[in-house]
Design a protein with these regions (language model features):
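HTH-adjacent hinge/linker in prokaryotic transcriptional regulators
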Residues: 2-9, 13-28, 34, 38-98, ...
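Glycine-rich beta-strand-to-loop/alpha-helix junction loops that act as flexible
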Residues: 100-102
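Internal active-site segments that recognize and position negatively charged phosphoryl groups
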Residues: 107, 127
Length: 257
């Protein structure tokens, strides 16, 4: 593959996933890791990537921008739907649950029984509107400053309200997790809310397709596998990651798209 084509493909991976791993790119593109490092250096010089240990991420303003946020719902659509369907199976009538603003979590509305009785709390404006269509679901929309990119409530007002509530189950989506189970993010506003939702829940379920698994962490730690009682992911998930879940005695539900 010619260098220019390779650079375009690497940039495309970055735009879709928010991060790339040198080893994975080397295997995917059939070139040496040294070649990938040189390619990443070029992207860094152009201002379209930021180097991390073992890979690269999008610059913060691009990672949080409309290109990334709008495109994430188009990534691994079949996997996300299968994960969302499995997540709905964890709901029981009368549950009080927290629904995150992730694209995988948002897909749950496609599979929820029409007449199920629930109380759903969410920071996501779009999720609140979708859940409100169900006749027996009581929706609490967390208020606060609304992010222009995620269309969800963020900031101290949202955090204070969330910290005053309790849930049976929190369904949490994450942008990035290492094989060792360290969950990180660039989105500072979202980190505090996800942490609060986990802390205020009896049980937390991690919803993540296999593209979220990487070797090295980025920027800010959000949580770890130990904070979750269940992981729902797809069959392409890294075997070392799955082994780590088993070692930590975390229930894993592996779905097929």
């Amino acid at each position: 593959m010619y260098k220019n084509n390779r650079l375009k493909q690497i940039q495309s991976f970055l735009e879709l996933h928010g991060s790339v791993d040198i080893s994975a790119l080397s295997r995917e593109l059939g070139v040496s890791e040294m070649t990938i490092r040189r390619d990443l250096s070029i992207l860094v010089s152009r201002g379209t990537a930021v180097r991390t240990h073992g890979g690269a991420i999008l610059p913060r303003e691009r990672y949080l921008g409309d290109v990334y946020m709008d495109s994430r719902s188009q990534i691994n659509v079949a996997e996300k739907k299968a994960i969302a369907k499995a997540a709905v199976a964890e709901l029981q009538p009368g549950d009080s649950v927290y629904i995150d603003d992730g694209s995988t979590v948002a897909a749950m509305t496609q599979f929820i029984p029409h007449n199920i009785q629930l109380r759903v709390t969410t920071t996501s404006m779009s999720a609140a509107l979708e859940f409100n269509k169900f006749p027996n679901i009581d929706v609490i929309a967390i208020g606060g400053r609304v992010s222009k990119t995620t269309k969800s409530a963020v900031g101290p007002i949202a955090l204070e309200l969330l910290q005053s509530m309790y849930f049976k189950t929190a369904f949490i989506g994450v942008p990035y997790i290492t094989v060792d189970g360290i969950i990180t993010s660039n989105a500072i506003d979202e980190i505090h809310l996800k942490k609060a939702a986990i802390a205020q829940s009896q049980r937390s379920i991690l919803l993540m397709d296999s593209s979220k698994i990487h070797k090295e962490p980025i920027n800010i730690k959000l949580a770890s596998l130990d904070d979750f009682q269940m992981v729902i992911t797809d069959s392409r998930a890294d075997s070392n990651f799955l082994a780590n879940c088993m070692e930590k005695k975390i229930q894993v539900n592996i779905v097929e798209p």
